[in-house]
Amino acid sequence: MANLKDIRDRIVSVKNTRKITEAMRLVAAAKVRRAQDQVLRSRPFADRLARVLENIQSRMQFEAADSPLLNKREVKTITLLAVTGDRGLCGGYNANIIKRTEKRYAELKGQGYSPDLVLIGKKAIGYFENRSSLYNIRATFKELEQVPTSEDAASITSEVLAEFLSESTDRVEVIFTKFVSLVSCNPTIQTLLPLDPQGIADSEDEIFRLTTKDSQLIIEKDAAPTNEEPKLPSDIVFEQSPDQLLNALLPLYLQNQLLRALQESAASELASRMTAMNNASDNAKELAKNLTIDYNKARQAAITQEILEVVGGASA
């Protein structure tokens, strides 16, 4: 059996590790709320922009619109935007996106297309750059804000827009993690370009808040509040032509779509980290409990051995 001092030192080490993982869990839980608030704050702009596009759509056929962002040309090159994080300790969050990107890349190559990658996050960059002979990397972005901002989305949007408009790529897809709940995050593929603003709809969001129960911090979920805005008047008059409006609004719509993907990915990363740290804390607690039992058994065995030696010496 292990030395008593070794077991005691390991118990102390495990308990200290549990303090760290518990602190990381609480920090991630608080940041999930911050990321969620960012999504809710950006929603009014997204809703109004969608309504304006819907109004324009009702007055013209998008298929007939003279906008390069809507043109569906023959597809030869497809750009994949892979969104991961800059840090680990978040379960399978980064690995799932990387696997999904590899699978999609192989699918497109097998179908005769020429895929390339735009990598967002250090984890994706590090993985695919180490395999640069197998993958064509177009651009990389790292060290974005923990809660993505419109500036982050704008820099990436400028890159993909330039490539699409110059016909260096014919389609752009984003692979990100859709935030479903604190325990469910799904890798998702969404086509960014060419744009198709039809069927715009916001799925129901959930909001999460820290509270206490039985002296323990817990997280409650609730439905996000929705504010019904009045629809734009049907007789509203636009000074510019529909084509001019589309050319001005569609880049904003694209940027908003990408921002939403970045925000959902950030929330998913934080939720995954919170879950991973919660599991680590539980495992550390169980390990400390088992080590304490081993320590007590070893201590009892040592005391029994000493008693036997004393009794044996007295008998002699």
Curated annotation (Swiss-Prot):
Intrachain S-S bonds: none
Subcellular location, record wording: Cellular thylakoid membrane
Membrane topology: Peripheral membrane protein
Keywords attached to this entry: ATP synthesis, CF(1), Hydrogen ion transport, Ion transport, Membrane, Thylakoid, Transport
One Pfam family this sequence matches: ATP-synt
Cellular-component GO terms for this entry: plasma membrane-derived thylakoid membrane; proton-transporting ATP synthase complex
InterPro entries hit by this protein: ATP_synth_F1_ATPase_gsu (IPR035968), ATP_synth_F1_gsu (IPR000131), ATP_synth_F1_gsu_CS (IPR023632)
Entry GO MF terms: ATP binding; proton-transporting ATP synthase activity, rotational mechanism
Its job: Produces ATP from ADP in the presence of a proton gradient across the membrane. The gamma chain is believed to be important in regulating ATPase activity and the flow of protons through the CF(0) complex.
Homology family: Belongs to the ATPase gamma chain family.
PANTHER family: ATP SYNTHASE GAMMA CHAIN (PTHR11693), ATP SYNTHASE GAMMA CHAIN, CHLOROPLASTIC (PTHR11693:SF41)
Subunit structure: F-type ATPases have 2 components, CF(1) - the catalytic core - and CF(0) - the membrane proton channel. CF(1) has five subunits: alpha(3), beta(3), gamma(1), delta(1), epsilon(1). CF(0) has three main subunits: a, b and c.
Record-given protein name: ATP synthase gamma chain
